[in-house]
Swiss-Prot record:
Subcellular location: Membrane
Protein's organism: Schizosaccharomyces pombe (strain 972 / ATCC 24843)
Coarse class of the protein's main subcellular location: membrane
Taxonomic superkingdom: Eukaryota
Regions crossing the membrane: 209-229, 247-267, 284-304, 308-328, 342-362, 374-394, 402-422
Lineage, top ranks: Eukaryota, Fungi, Dikarya, Ascomycota, Taphrinomycotina
Keyword Transmembrane helix annotated: yes
Entry protein name: Uncharacterized protein C30D11.11
MF GO annotations: metal ion binding; signaling receptor activity
Length: 442
């Protein structure tokens, strides 16, 4: 940490000589000693600002500018002061007066007790040095606290990994960064190895049901895509664009289900960075499914309204890309933002209301409701699932009783499978009904 240099009497006399040598030969003074004192203090301020650059860089290295508290406000004041005099070689009375005004404007009455310029300048120097020292002490302590905290977290993770190598652990034993549901008390895995996570697919724990519901559905939809759809009569009767839309939806559904399996398989990794990547993949899969579901409706429903269809698909596609990008932001996987995540995906799904309302307006309520019947069933399934998931029902009422079977996340998984199945039946129906609906062909 930087310290302030103290001046001996010999150095003080040297300053006086330097200051007197700076005076113009025609400069007239009433009291030479007062002027020497005044310029001596100015020179000390000049020296303070010269050293400020190095000390501010040190504070920046300690991460002080990233804080959002009073210390950061003081740092910003000093940074602005430093920027105001960047490149200035020697201060004069005008520049010092500017510093005094800035201090008085920001800190009100701190200089009010001083009635002379030298007194104010000396007080300002003391004030600035005091605050800078406080910042340096604060930054060093914060750095030490962070290092201590990181050591503590590392110890907790290592302890949990040792327990996880022997048995399933409890929520209390699980490091807080891995918490996702405060009402699921037991049955947690915690491994240092990806291989152990993968092998745990075949073991019994609180993620087994979540893994196998979506893994089974993934296999079913893969079979549909790879065999049943290409060998069906609808493949033969469909044009290329209809095939592309159906394949696009099936791939998006499989992506959602597959990413979910990856997340629930590797959510037990003790490497936080890798665990978070698995979580992000889950969110990316959800975004892809929502966007693909809406686009599959827009493509068929507005086939005879080309410009409108293009606008809707472009809008939904853009939101889908945002949904694929946003989960990779650092804050997105934190539990305290869980409600934000839910509202984000609900909002993404609600973007489909715009084309739906347009369909009601253009084609009428009865025709639209009949045409979108499978979609409404799909939406209803998703809504039920979101309610259970968002409210932690039923485990919030009986914590620990639904750790392995019957908790809200498992209900949400079933709701997703049902919703995807309903929507897929809708996509198949759209291929035969879209002309009658969109183009008015009877």
């Amino acid at each position: 940490m930087s310290t302030v240099k103290t001046f001996s009497s010999t150095e003080t006399e040297g300053f006086k000589k330097r200051l007197l040598s700076r005076r113009h030969s025609s400069y007239q003074v009433r009291d030479e000693e007062d002027d020497v004192l005044e310029e001596f203090i100015v020179l000390k301020l000049d020296l303070f600002l010269t050293r400020l650059n190095h000390r501010m860089k040190r504070l920046e290295e300690l991460g002080l500018p990233n804080r959002k508290d009073a210390a950061a406000a003081t740092y910003q004041f000093l940074a602005n002061l430093q920027a105001s005099f960047l490149g200035t070689t020697i201060l004069g009375k005008t520049q010092v007066s500017f510093i005094l005004r800035r201090i008085e404007e920001t800190y009100n009455d701190v200089l009010s007790a001083c009635d002379t310029f030298p007194a104010k300048a000396q007080k300002a120097l003391t004030f600035l040095e005091h605050h800078l020292r406080d910042l340096e002490d604060y930054a060093e302590k914060s750095k030490n606290n962070v290092e201590t905290l990181m050591t503590d977290i590392k110890d907790v993770v290592e302890h949990a990994a040792k327990l996880g190598a022997q048995r399933l652990i409890t929520l209390e034993e699980l490091p807080v960064q891995w918490h996702n549901n405060p009402y699921i008390i037991r049955g947690y895995r915690f491994y240092t190895s990806k291989r152990k996570c993968f092998r745990s697919i075949l073991s019994w724990h609180n993620e087994t049901f979540n893994i196998w519901t979506h893994l089974s559905a993934f296999i079913v939809f893969f079979a549909v895509l790879a065999y049943f759809y290409p060998s069906s009569s609808s493949w033969v009767s469909s044009n290329v664009s209809n095939r592309i839309v159906r394949i696009f939806f099936l791939l998006s559904a499989m992506k959602c289900l597959g990413c979910s399996v990856i997340w629930h398989t590797f959510s037990s990794l003790s490497n936080y960075k890798h665990m978070r990547c698995a979580a992000c993949m889950d969110y990316v899969g959800i975004s892809a499914l929502i966007a693909a579901s809406i686009i599959s409706v827009e493509y068929h429903a507005f086939v005879c309204q080309g410009p409108l269809r293009f606008i809707f698909i472009a809008f939904t596609g853009t939101l889908g890309l945002i949904g694929i990008y946003t989960p990779w932001k650092k804050w997105f996987n934190e539990y305290k933002y869980r409600s934000v995540k839910i509202f984000f995906f609900v909002g993404l799904a609600c973007s489909g209301l715009i084309p739906m309302i347009t369909m009601f307006y253009i084609k009428g309520t009865r025709r639209t409701v009949k045409y979108l019947d499978p979609v409404f069933k799909s939406i209803f399934s998703y809504i039920i699932g979101v309610l259970f998931y968002g409210l932690h029902i039923p485990e919030r009422f009986l914590p620990g009783k639904f750790d392995i079977i019957g908790n809200s996340h498992q209900i949400w998984h079933i709701a997703i499978i049902v919703g995807v199945a309903f929507h897929y039946t809708g996509v198949k129906r759209f291929e035969t009904d879209y002309e009658a609906f969109s183009c008015g062909v009877l």
